[in-house]
Amino acid sequence: MPQVAKYDTTGNRVGDIDLADNVFNEEVNEHVVHQVVTAQLATMRRGTASTKTRGEVSGGGRKPWRQKGTGRARHGSIRSPLWVGGGIVFGPRPRKHIKKVPKKVKKLALRSILSYKSQNEELIILDELKFDTPKTKQVVELLSNLNLEGKKVLIILPDKDANIYLSARNIPGVKTLVVDALNAFDLLNNDCIVMSEEAVKRVEEVLAR
């Protein structure tokens, strides 16, 4: 069972916390992580790219010139793919890029990423994270106390907290996420993850199933 330091919001170490082996100390499965992130990014695509075939391009209803006697190559329509402004052959069409991944595989990917973060000291645990009012200055001071200025930081919350969300949303590179919305891409796309002891317990409850 890995044991990591626990800090307060001023950056002082206030003790240690034991993390669950089956969530924060698993063998990192890079293949599964790649599979889940790729599927997630594919699902995020709009899939609206579209081109017109020769049957959809306007104009070109009649033969541009007679078949023989002009000295030019024979053509039957200006909508041919050979012409500038003609139809496109095998061009993109609107479609869904959704890739389905089993829930067990998604959870395995999340555990792998959290284990990687824990093993590489990219995970900071706070004894508590509460703000009475929404003020950006509070999060700026927190990041400064934890030596995280200028870094991409993901703050994981046990539940929705408007004060923390509003305090962090205007800071470049900082994102907040509740435990129920954890996903592989956001867990990977940062330099460090910050979460409270309460959030750790909530993560262990969700991912240990």
UniProtKB/Swiss-Prot annotation:
Q: Does the keyword Metal-binding apply?
A: no
Q: Which domain of life is it from?
A: Bacteria
PANTHER family to which the protein is assigned, alphabetical: 50S RIBOSOMAL PROTEIN L4, LARGE RIBOSOMAL SUBUNIT PROTEIN UL4M
Protein keywords = Ribonucleoprotein, Ribosomal protein, RNA-binding, rRNA-binding
**What are the recorded Gene Ontology BP terms?**
translation
| Quaternary structure, from the entry | Part of the 50S ribosomal subunit.
- Record's compositionally biased regions (Basic residues): 63-76
Q: Where is this region: Disordered?
A: 46-76
Q: What is this protein called?
A: Large ribosomal subunit protein uL4
Q: Please list the GO terms describing molecular function.
A: rRNA binding; structural constituent of ribosome
**Family the UniProt entry places it in:** Belongs to the universal ribosomal protein uL4 family.
Function statement: One of the primary rRNA binding proteins, this protein initially binds near the 5'-end of the 23S rRNA. It is important during the early stages of 50S assembly. It makes multiple contacts with different domains of the 23S rRNA in the assembled 50S subunit and ribosome.
Q: Gene3D superfamilies per the record?
A: 3.40.1370.10
